[in-house]
């Protein structure tokens, strides 16, 4: 009897430790998603800074009234080529970071802790409820498992009516989101600086991805970029005008 109790207790302790390890691993992966996203935002900031310097160079050339039109056009072309050359390394680095981000998100979605002690009570609550839970309550449940795609899908499977669609909507497709970000950045990098208008979209998608996994970046994104939305829009307008 004592041996059976000892084995049971040891097994329970081992399971608790395993769950703690899973939770720690999940927390580390979530932080990694945030850290990589911040690195990408900083890289995008370098593209913004480089373009600012480029426009300043063009402005200085245009001010020289003694320069011929042909000379100014040649200087503009040279400045643009230098801009693309100087930022090529930054674009390559961001591509590598986004690949790492996708791998991290894939690992996160596959290893999230569905053995969370709070999961089964919530599954039971949704399964046994005769009708959909109030929005405030289902929102609290979703917040509890924010970023845990597998847990949210498990809850959605037993949820009623609009609770089901609500929970499914909260179960972020991290892999698909990162693929979309990578595609947008590829278009941005391949056409830079003419594709500068894609930069705010990439930034916003990164912020949303982090929020989906429970890490708020918010206004700090502009700090990492070194420019706010107004600055970027101004640069986009200058590029569109050929300035």
Label each PLM-derived region with a short phrase.
Residues 1-23:
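Short, Lys/Arg-enriched N-terminal segments with co-localized hydrophobic residues
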Residues 9-11, 20, 29, 201, ...:
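Detector for intrinsically disordered, low-structure N-terminal pre-sequences
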Residues 11-13, 26, 221, 241:
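Intrinsic disorder/low-complexity segments
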Residues 18-20, 108, 115, 230:
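Intrinsic disorder/low-complexity signal
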Residues 18-74:
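Short, charged, low-complexity amphipathic alpha-helix
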Residues 25-42, 73-172:
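Long, charge-patterned amphipathic interaction tracts in eukaryotic proteins
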Residues 37-40, 44-47, 51, 87, ...:
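Long amphipathic alpha-helices with heptad-repeat character
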Residues 118-243:
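A long, low-hydrophobicity, low-complexity, charged/polar interaction segment common
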């Amino acid at each position: 009897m004592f041996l059976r109790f000892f084995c049971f207790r040891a097994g329970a302790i081992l399971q608790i430790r395993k769950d703690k390890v899973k939770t720690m691993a999940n927390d580390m992966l979530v932080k990694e998603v945030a850290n990589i996203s911040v690195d990408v935002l900083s890289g995008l900031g370098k593209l913004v800074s480089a373009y600012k310097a480029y426009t300043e160079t063009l402005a200085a050339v245009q001010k020289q009234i003694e320069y011929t039109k042909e000379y100014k056009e040649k200087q503009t072309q040279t400045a643009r080529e230098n801009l693309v050359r100087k930022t090529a390394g930054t674009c390559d680095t961001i591509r590598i970071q986004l690949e790492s981000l996708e791998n991290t998100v894939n690992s996160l979605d596959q290893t999230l802790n569905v053995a969370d002690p709070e999961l089964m009570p919530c599954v039971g609550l949704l399964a046994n409820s005769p009708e959909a839970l109030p929005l405030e309550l289902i929102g609290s449940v979703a917040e509890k498992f924010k970023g845990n795609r597998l847990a949210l899908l498990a809850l959605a499977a037993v949820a009623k009516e609009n609770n089901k669609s609500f929970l499914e909507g909260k179960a972020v497709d991290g892999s698909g989101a990162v693929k979309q970000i990578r595609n947008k950045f590829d278009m941005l990098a391949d056409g830079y600086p003419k594709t500068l208008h894609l930069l705010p979209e990439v930034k916003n998608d990164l912020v949303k991805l982090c929020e989906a996994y429970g890490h708020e970046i918010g206004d700090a994104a502009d700090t990492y970029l070194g420019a706010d939305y107004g600055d970027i829009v101004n640069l986009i307008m200058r590029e569109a005008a050929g300035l």
